[in-house]
């Protein structure tokens, strides 16, 4: 990520006293294991991504997601149901969403997990995404 933004996030983590709780990771080879270790997954990109892959992967593992409110995250995260969307680059909003996520009860987390898994199964399986892509081609390409 961006060094300045990472430093801002680290400062926010310090301000809320969560240094031993929140871990900003670098590259990881075993993402399913990383997701299973997480109570909440953050995808705080400052530039829009075409598809919110991190959010979709985390949701498939039943993890709530806090994501920047732009790009593909708007399709993969349902604000208030499967996670939270925050303005890109707004570390205060990110900290507030994280505070909310970390203070959820077990029952609330379980509800979010069920919603997240259901959302991925309904919209982001390979057959569903292929069907959606083919439907777009069918709509756009002229028939002979």
Regions found by a protein language model. Give the residues of each.
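Glycosyltransferase donor-sugar binding loop
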Residues: 1-7
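C-terminal alpha-helical cap of glycosyltransferases
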Residues: 126-144
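Short alpha-helical donor nucleotide-sugar binding micro-motif in glycosyltransferases
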Residues: 27-28, 34-38, 53
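Nucleotide-activated donor-binding/catalytic signature segment of Leloir-type glycosyltransferases, i.e.
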Residues: 7-26
